[in-house]
């Protein structure tokens, strides 16, 4: 299977895992070793979080005054990551020509001050071991779509799952609630 980096994984209705039910995952990495992504359409209802580094708390809580904190996934749920536009920011890793990822909280201050940079903050991430994601896709658990920065950064999180399924030309009610092959 070709790399699905910079693609969306869209969960199908039968996927009832609490993290992934009606989720859209942005894949930041996918290779023969496995895959890593961030759920872009679920927020945590929390105003303040505390990290081990107290200086990071200040930057993080300033950011959270104006932005959501998203559930990135069930892996390393005490770790903060963020996606942002503008690949010219140091200490970030490009995912595509338009999107980068970072775990460096100190960057939040400069990102928040820039009117040209859009961002999303996540707690935790989704991860798959070698071959695991491919098996889930073959099993019919995920739909695949090329990513869109407007969906990642501009859409209301409650609408993202429906928008992505509709953009595939799929009526979600037409998808079976059981997995496997037809």
What are these regions (language model features)?
Residues 1-122, 126-182:
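A short aromatic-anchored loop/beta-hairpin motif
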